[in-house]
Design a protein with these regions (language model features):
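Pre-Walker A adenine-sensing motif
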Residues: 1-10
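Walker A/P-loop NTP-binding active-site region of P-loop NTPases
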Residues: 13-79, 131, 136
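Conserved beta-strand segments of the P-loop GTPase G domain that flank and frequently precede/overlap
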Residues: 18, 47, 99-100, 133-135, ...
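P-loop/Walker-type NTP enzyme "switch/lid" segment
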Residues: 46-126, 226
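P-loop/Walker A phosphate-binding loop and immediately adjacent motor/lid segment at beta-alpha junctions
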Residues: 112-118, 171-196, 233
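Inter-motif core of Ras-like GTPase G domains
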Residues: 128, 143-163
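Beta-strand-loop-alpha "switch" segments that mediate conformational coupling across diverse proteins
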Residues: 191-234
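NTP-binding/hydrolysis catalytic cores, primarily Walker-type P-loop NTPases
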Residues: 226-255
Length: 255
C-alpha cells in the first residue's frame, strides 16, 4: 500500500492541450474543462499560449492588480519552479492561470528559447497534485508554446469548426501533424458548432474523416466567457455539460 502511494506521488501529472482552428471555441472549452475538473477536486493550471489575445484578461477581466505574467516568468534570469508559481494568478481555489497579461504581446519580452519552453512544461508537469490545461493557438508552426504543448501533451483535444474554415485548416495542418512527434492518430478530434448559420454535420464528418464527437454551440458559455465568469459560473445547458464531462472523463480516466 505504501509503495503504491509513493508511486502515485512520483507520477508526473497530465498535460492537456486544447488545439484547433480559429473560432472553434478553444478558450471556452479549456475554461469549461478546467471548471469541471476543479469541481471534482483536481487542481488545474491553465496555460495561455496566445500572445495576441492573452488568456488572463479574458478569463478574469476584472483583475487589475496582478502583475504576474508568463512572459515575465519565461524571460527571468532566475527561471525555476518558484518563478513560475509567482506568476500564476489564482482565479479560484483550484484553478490558476499562467499567461501573458493585459497589454502584453510577443514583443513585450525578449525572444524565448526552445530550451526555456521545454523547461517550462517539464516544471509544470512536476507540480504536485496539479494537471495542466494549455489553451493553444491555431498556429503550431509559429507558436513554440503551442507546438511543445501538443508534442508533450498526454491528451490533445483538437477542435475543428463544422464549416469550410475547419475543413481547410484540417487539410493544411495534417501534413505537419503527421510527424511522429505529434502522435496525431491519438488526438481527440471534436467538431464544434456555431450559431452563425446552419451546418451540415454529416458532410463535414465525411470530409474530415476521424471525428470523435461534437461540441454544441452554447449561448450561456459564450456569454460567461465574454463576462469573464466562465470559471466561476455553472452553465445551465445539459447537452453542453454532458460533452464537457465526457471530455474530462477521457482526460481523467488514467489518473
Amino acid at each position: 500500500m505504501l509503495l503504491q502511494e509513493v508511486r502515485k506521488q512520483l507520477m508526473a501529472h497530465k498535460i492537456i492541450a486544447v488545439y484547433g482552428n480559429s473560432g472553434s471555441y478553444k478558450t471556452t472549452t479549456a475554461l469549461s474543462l478546467a471548471r469541471y475538473m476543479a469541481s471534482k477536486g483536481t487542481n488545474i493550471i491553465l496555460v495561455g499560449a496566445d500572445t495576441t489575445k492573452p488568456l488572463l484578461p479574458v478569463a478574469a477581466p476584472l483583475e487589475s492588480k496582478f502583475a504576474g505574467s508568463l512572459g515575465k516568468a519565461l524571460s527571468s534570469v532566475d527561471f525555476d519552479r518558484d518563478m513560475i508559481l509567482k506568476n500564476i494568478y489564482m482565479a479560484t481555489d483550484h484553478v490558476g492561470i499562467l499567461s501573458y497579461n493585459i497589454r502584453e504581446n510577443a514583443n513585450t519580452y525578449a525572444v524565448v528559447s526552445q530550451e526555456r519552453i521545454d523547461d517550462l512544461y517539464m516544471q509544470l508537469r512536476q507540480q504536485s497534485d496539479t494537471d495542466i490545461i494549455v489553451d493553444c493557438t491555431s498556429d503550431i508552426s509559429q507558436s513554440k508554446l503551442t507546438a511543445k504543448a501538443v508534442i508533450t501533451a498526454d491528451v490533445v483535444i483538437e477542435l475543428l469548426t463544422c464549416d469550410t474554415n475547419g475543413l481547410v485548416f484540417d487539410g493544411s495542418q495534417e501534413p505537419i501533424l503527421q510527424s511522429e512527434q505529434y502522435t496525431y492518430r491519438k488526438f481527440v478530434r471534436m467538431m464544434s458548432f456555431s450559431s452563425v448559420f446552419k451546418q451540415d454535420e454529416a458532410a463535414m464528418k465525411n470530409a474530415m474523416g476521424r471525428i470523435s464527437g461534437t461540441i454544441p454551440y452554447c449561448p450561456k458559455a459564450a456569454e460567461y466567457l465574454n463576462q469573464g465568469t466562465l470559471l466561476t459560473k455553472g452553465v445551465d445547458d445539459r447537452t453542453y455539460n454532458t460533452t464537457i464531462k465526457s471530455l474530462a472523463e477521457i482526460i481523467m480516466k488514467e489518473e
